[in-house]
């Protein structure tokens, strides 16, 4: 990973913002249904195609894995991970909580991540060993740091929906966790994890996620001083589920979600 990789990721996000802004709320937005019954729009495809074209020119030796057009899942060497619009359901309904997620993995470990949410006028990014940062409406970036909350009864928790927690026993444990913490909100998708990195939320959890949902978020959370694992406690974005915390609460959250 070099400084140029971060600059490239930020430039890719700039272009993604241009493409998504003009399609958000467009009356002629094309919406299709994928085999997994989730929506995909012409904006999703346009962003991922543009990212792939740029990487093919500027990083021809790097791999690319994206939500819409796939790619290798061996996770060796240098590989860019792209979720062109995280929060497509929000996008199609006119809800401004959506973002383009772009990450660089080196041998499966995120080294650069950018989360860009133009409808919120916010962006978060991080590079390995260089910290995590955010900017609001293009203002001067500020460095991110997770909270120092050390007790669950004082903690704020965010998630996306209850439907994924339906596995027998898991929903009960999750609801038990929500009953224990101080505050629960469903900020959802990328925003839960970015708020953990900002120190505004202490816990984010999702039972079903893909690597493109997490790769950029993983390094943003970690570089802000937090911790991100699967529900099984495996570090990184590959576990198919996610728990992100300020680090101080992590082990207790995992214990509660895996009890029984």
From Swiss-Prot:
Enzyme class: hydrolase
GO biological process per UniProt: L-histidine biosynthetic process; mycothiol biosynthetic process
Pathway listed: Amino-acid biosynthesis; L-histidine biosynthesis; L-histidine from 5-phospho-alpha-D-ribose 1-diphosphate: step 8/9
Consequence of gene loss (knockout): Strains lacking this gene appear to be not viable, even in the presence of high levels of exogenous inositol.
SUPFAM superfamilies for this protein: Carbohydrate phosphatase
Gene Ontology MF terms in the entry: histidinol-phosphatase activity; inositol monophosphate 1-phosphatase activity; metal ion binding; phosphoric ester hydrolase activity
Cofactor: Mg(2+)
Induction behaviour: When comparing gene expression levels of the four IMPase family genes in exponential cultures of M.tuberculosis, the level of cysQ is the highest, almost equal to sigA; impA and impC are expressed at approximately 40% of this level, while suhB is lowest, at 12% of the cysQ level.
Key words, A-Z: Amino-acid biosynthesis, Histidine biosynthesis, Hydrolase, Magnesium, Metal-binding
Residues noted as binding Mg(2+) 1 in the record, renumbered to the chain: 67, 83, 85
Binding sites annotated in the UniProt record for Mg(2+) 2: 83, 86, 213
Keyword Cytoplasm: no
EC number, UniProt record: 3.1.3.15
Keyword presence, Hydrolase: yes
Catalytic activity, reaction form: L-histidinol phosphate + H2O = L-histidinol + phosphate
Binding locations of substrate: 67, 85-88, 185, 213
Pfam family, one: Inositol_P
InterPro entries reported in the protein's UniProt record: His_9_proposed (IPR011809), Inositol_monoP_metal-BS (IPR020583), Inositol_monophosphatase-like (IPR000760)
Gene Ontology, cellular component aspect: cytosol; plasma membrane
Family membership noted in the UniProt record: Belongs to the inositol monophosphatase superfamily.
NCBIfam families found in the cross-reference section: his_9_HisN (TIGR02067)
Functional note: Catalyzes the dephosphorylation of histidinol-phosphate to histidinol, the direct precursor of histidine.
Protein name per the record: Histidinol-phosphatase
Species of the source: Mycobacterium tuberculosis (strain ATCC 25618 / H37Rv)
Gene name, Swiss-Prot/TrEMBL: hisN
């Amino acid at each position: 990973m070099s400084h140029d990789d971060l600059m490239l990721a930020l430039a890719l996000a700039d272009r993604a913002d241009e493409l998504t802004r003009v399609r958000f709320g467009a009356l002629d937005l094309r919406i299709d249904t994928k085999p997994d019954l989730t929506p995909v729009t012409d904006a999703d495809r346009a962003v991922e195609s543009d990212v792939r074209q740029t990487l093919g020119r500027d990083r021809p030796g790097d791999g690319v894995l994206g939500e819409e057009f796939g790619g290798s899942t061996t996770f060796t060497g240098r590989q860019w991970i792209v979720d062109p619009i995280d929060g497509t359901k929000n996008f199609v309904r006119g809800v401004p909580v959506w973002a383009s997620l772009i990450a660089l993995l080196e041998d499966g470990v995120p080294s650069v991540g950018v989360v860009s949410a133009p409808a919120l006028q916010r962006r978060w990014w991080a590079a390995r060993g260089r910290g995590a940062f955010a900017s609001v409406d293009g203002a001067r970036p500020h460095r991110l740091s997770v909270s120092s909350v050390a007790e669950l009864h004082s903690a704020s928790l965010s998630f996306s929906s209850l439907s994924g927690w339906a596995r027998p026993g898991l929903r009960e444990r999750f609801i038990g966790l929500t009953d224990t913490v101080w505050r629960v909100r469903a900020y959802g998708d990328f925003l839960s994890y970015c708020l953990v990195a900002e120190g505004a939320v202490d816990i984010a959890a999702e039972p079903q996620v893909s690597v493109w949902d997490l790769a950029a978020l993983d390094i943003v959370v970690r570089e802000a001083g937090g911790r991100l694992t699967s529900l099984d406690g495996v570090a990184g974005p590959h576990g198919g589920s996610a728990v992100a915390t300020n680090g101080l609460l992590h082990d207790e959250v995992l214990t509660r979600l895996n009890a029984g």
